[in-house]
C-alpha cells in the first residue's frame, strides 16, 4: 500500500494512515467469482492475491489481511462479525456476512473497516461511542448501541447526477439516511466466516454471484465499476453536494479500467 511510518508510533494517527493507504491501494472487488476462481480466506492465498498479484478482495479477505498487519505491528485488534442491511428487504441479513475490526489505541476503542467499499466506506476509524455523529469526507457516520447490538448508519449529502438518464438507476443511492450494518462485540475468528464465504460465492441468491464489482477510493472520492457501468463520486464537490458521474463501458474499456 506504499505506507512508510517515520513516526513509529502505534496511535490513532498511524492507524488512520494505514486505513487510508489500504482503501486507496486495495480495491473492494469480487472479480475472482466471475473469472472462475475462488475467493480464498487463508492468509497466504490473500497475500498472494492482493500483494503479489496487485488485486483486491471482499471484506472477508481485505479485513483479514488488515487484521494480520495491525496485530503484527502491535495494535490490540479483534475480529467482529457484521449483519449487512438490505434496503430492498428492509432488514439486516440473517447470517453474519461481514468482517470488521475493533482496535484499541490510546485508551479508546475504534471500529476499523477497509472492506465495505463504494460510497459506504469509512475513511477514518470510528470511535466506538453510541449516538455520536462522526464527520468524515464521504459522509457523517453514526454508531448506535441498543441492548448490546451496535448499528452503523450514515447521513449522506445531496448529490448532483451529471447524467440525467441515470437518475433512477439502481446503482444510485437515493436515501439521505442509510443503515449499513449491525454487529456485536463478540470476538470472532476467521474460521467463523468459512461457511458464509462459500455461500456468498456459490449461491444464486447472493448479490456477489449475480454482479461483478470493483471499487477504489481516491483522495477526493470513489470509483466503482459494477458490470460494465463505471461510476465516479466526488465527495463534497460544491455546496455540500456530491458529484456523481456514470459511464457505460465496452469490454475493452472495462479491461483498461481494471
Swiss-Prot record:
CoA binds at residues 199, 205. Its EC number is 2.3.1.5. Its main location: cytoplasm. One of its GO terms (molecular function) is arylamine N-acetyltransferase activity. Keywords: Acyltransferase, Cytoplasm, Transferase. Substrate binds at residues 97-98. GO terms for cellular component: cytoplasm. It comes from the Eukaryota. Transmembrane segments: none annotated. It catalyses: an arylamine + acetyl-CoA = an N-acetylarylamine + CoA. It is found in: Cytoplasm. The active site is at 59 (acyl-thioester intermediate), 98, 113. Belongs to the arylamine N-acetyltransferase family. Participates in the detoxification of a plethora of hydrazine and arylamine drugs. This is Arylamine N-acetyltransferase 1. It comes from Felis catus (Cat). The lineage of its organism: Eukaryota, Metazoa, Chordata, Craniata, Vertebrata.
Amino acid at each position: 500500500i506504499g505506507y512508510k511510518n517515520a513516526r513509529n508510533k502505534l496511535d490513532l494517527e498511524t492507524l488512520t494512515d494505514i486505513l487510508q493507504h489500504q482503501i486507496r491501494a486495495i480495491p473492494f472487488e469480487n472479480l475472482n467469482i466471475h473469472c472462475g476462481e475462488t475467493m480464498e480466506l487463508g492468509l497466504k492465498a490473500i497475500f498472494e492475491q492482493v500483494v503479489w498479484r496487485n488485486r483486491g478482495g471482499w471484506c472477508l479477505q481485505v479485513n483479514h489481511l488488515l487484521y494480520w498487519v495491525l496485530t503484527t505491528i502491535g495494535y490490540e485488534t479483534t475480529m467482529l462479525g457484521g449483519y449487512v442491511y438490505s434496503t430492498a428487504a428492509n432488514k439486516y441479513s440473517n447470517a453474519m456476512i461481514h468482517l470488521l475490526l475493533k482496535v484499541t489505541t490510546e485508551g479508546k476503542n475504534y471500529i476499523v473497516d477497509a472492506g465495505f467499499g463504494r460510497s459506504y466506506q469509512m475513511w477514518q476509524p470510528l470511535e466506538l461511542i453510541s449516538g455520536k455523529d462522526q464527520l468524515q469526507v464521504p459522509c457523517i457516520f453514526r454508531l448506535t448501541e441498543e441492548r448490546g447490538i451496535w448499528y452503523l448508519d450514515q447521513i449522506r449529502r445531496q448529490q448532483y447526477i451529471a447524467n440525467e438518464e441515470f437518475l433512477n438507476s439502481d446503482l444510485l443511492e437515493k436515501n439521505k439516511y442509510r443503515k449499513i450494518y449491525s454487529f456485536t462485540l463478540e470476538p470472532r475468528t476467521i474460521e467463523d466466516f468459512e461457511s458464509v464465504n462459500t455461500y456468498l460465492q456459490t449461491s444464486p441468491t447472493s448479490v456477489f454471484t449475480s454482479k461483478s464489482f470493483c471499487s477504489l477510493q481516491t483522495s477526493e472520492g470513489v470509483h466503482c465499476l459494477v458490470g460494465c457501468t463505471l461510476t465516479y463520486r466526488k465527495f463534497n464537490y460544491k455546496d455540500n453536494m456530491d458529484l456523481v458521474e456514470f459511464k457505460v463501458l465496452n469490454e475493452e474499456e472495462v479491461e483498461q479500467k481494471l
